[in-house]
Curated annotation (Swiss-Prot):
This is Phosphatase PSR1. Residues 14-34, 49-80, 184-214 have a biased composition (Polar residues). It comes from Saccharomyces cerevisiae (strain ATCC 204508 / S288c) (Baker's yeast). Residues 253-411 form the FCP1 homology domain. GO terms for cellular component: cytosol; phosphatase complex; plasma membrane. The gene is PSR1. Residues 119-130 have a biased composition (Acidic residues). Its EC number is 3.1.3.-. Interacts with WHI2. One of its GO terms (molecular function) is phosphoprotein phosphatase activity. Residues 14-223 are annotated as: Disordered. Residues 35-48 have a biased composition (Basic residues). It holds the Pfam family NIF. There is a cross-link at residue 154 (Glycyl lysine isopeptide (Lys-Gly) (interchain with G-Cter in ubiquitin)).
Length: 427
């Protein structure tokens, strides 16, 4: 008995070892299958391709399970019963769960795709609806516009028909005369449209004539409003004693000479209240009960210029400065007494706040008056009588006064010509 039992024990151990090795091989194979399935699933998800992996066959697991049962001694259970029952091994459970998860993921993906397709279809339908509405609105607008134009045309036709004179019933004498004219031959007939056109033309011509007359009247009113008699003096404006002009009549020494009007500041001299090292002389001027020093610089060539023009013209210094400054300055500047007259700010014409030198009030013919000034605003009323000159401040190389002398000499010789016409062409 001891020998047999030992043999039986050995056989049972060998059978158990064989069954254990078979069980381990089964587990390793199932794990490898699960790994391959998971790897394939990840690839299909990344590529966006939905692959349907068939679950592992239950027959193999059932066959392996039956073989293990047979080895352990449970041979009474058939393979069909094992297929119906759930496997009790952990590998089979893992495979079942993976297959279930795969099917759920596929269902979810398919549902999402359906939702996206439905959403795209809804958007397309909404866009089509908007296009249809717009097209309907455009068609309606066009139809309304056509209706409006047709109504307007009908109204115009009705108005034309109403405006046309209605034919009056003809008398018997008129009908007889028409029949006689038809027997005699064709006559020229004038349609009502031509008559209406003629009437309209006559109305237009009459209205245009009326508008022209009204425009002429308006122009005359504007001219009356804009016209200013520059020869009239303003209230408080300076004038020569006993005369309504700025200057008295010419005396024997200036008869037959043209009148040359010269500006003072920045034309003949430059003066400043600030200290000037190069000042030719200094004036003491009283302003608001205070004495101020005025530093004066002579323009280069001013003495020679005054000497030359004093022999050719009636020289008048016309400045917008006050007399209490201008008089002492001219006393120093005009040592040879070549300046015949002096006019200051009170002799200027006040036009919109500006001091204008009105040449019409000088008391000399405009054809004989020349003005030399650095400010165009001063001679704005008579620009054709001006000789422009640049403003001078301290340039020691300036020669404009001497350069103008030849032009002035030519103008002084031509006594019979209008100075304004000559200067308007040459300058």
């Amino acid at each position: 008995m001891g020998f047999i039992s030992s043999i039986l024990c050995c056989s049972s151990e060998t059978t158990q070892s064989n069954s254990n090795s078979a069980y381990r091989q089964q587990q390793s194979s199932s794990l490898n299958k699960n790994r391959s399935v998971k790897h394939s699933n990840t690839k299909s998800r990344t590529r966006g391709v939905h692959q349907t992996n068939s679950p592992p066959s239950k027959t193999n697991s059932a066959a392996t399970f039956s073989s293990t049962e047979r080895s352990t001694g449970k041979s009474g259970i058939s393979t069909n019963d094992n297929e119906k029952k759930k496997p009790s091994s952990p590998t089979a459970a893992v495979t079942a769960t993976t297959t279930n998860n795969m099917t759920k993921v596929e269902k979810r993906i398919s549902k999402d795709d359906l939702y996206e397709e439905k959403y795209e279809v809804d958007e397309d339908e909404e866009i089509d609806d908007e296009d249809n509405r717009r097209s309907r609105g455009i068609v309606q607008e066009k139809g309304d516009a056509v209706k409006d134009t047709s109504r307007q045309k009908k109204q115009q036709q009705q108005q034309q028909q109403q405006s046309q004179p209605q034919p009056q019933p003809q008398s018997q004498s008129q009908s007889q005369s028409q029949s006689q004219s038809q027997q005699r031959g064709p006559t020229v007939q004038v349609s009502s449209d031509h008559l209406i056109q003629d009437m309209n033309l006559s109305r237009v011509s009459s209205s245009s004539q009326a508008s022209e007359t009204s425009n002429d009247a308006d122009d005359e009113d504007d001219e009356d409003e804009e016209y200013i008699d520059l020869t009239l003096l303003q209230q408080g404006q300076y004038h020569a004693p006993g005369y309504n002009t700025l200057l008295p009549p010419q005396d024997e020494s200036t008869k037959g000479k043209k009148c040359l009007i010269l500006d003072l500041d920045e034309t003949l001299v430059h003066s400043s209240f600030k200290y000037l090292r190069s000042a030719d002389f200094v004036l003491s001027v009283e302003i608001d009960d205070q004495v101020h020093n005025v530093y004066v610089i002579k323009r280069p060539g001013v003495e020679e210029f005054l000497e030359r023009v004093g022999k050719l013209f009636e020289v008048v210094v016309f400045t917008a400065s006050v007399s209490r400054y201008g008089d002492p300055l001219l006393d120093i500047l005009d040592t040879d007494k070549v300046i015949h007259h002096r006019l200051f700010r009170e002799a200027c014409y006040n036009y919109e706040g500006n001091y204008i030198k009105n040449l019409s009030q000088i008391g000399r013919p405009l054809s004989d008056i020349i003005i030399l000034d650095n400010s165009p605003a001063s001679y704005i009323f008579h620009p054709q009588h001006a000789i422009p000159i640049s403003s001078w401040f301290s340039d020691t190389h300036d020669n404009e006064l001497l350069d103008i002398i030849p032009l002035l000499e030519d103008l002084s010789v031509k006594t019979s010509l209008d100075v304004g016409k000559i200067l308007d062409v040459t300058i």
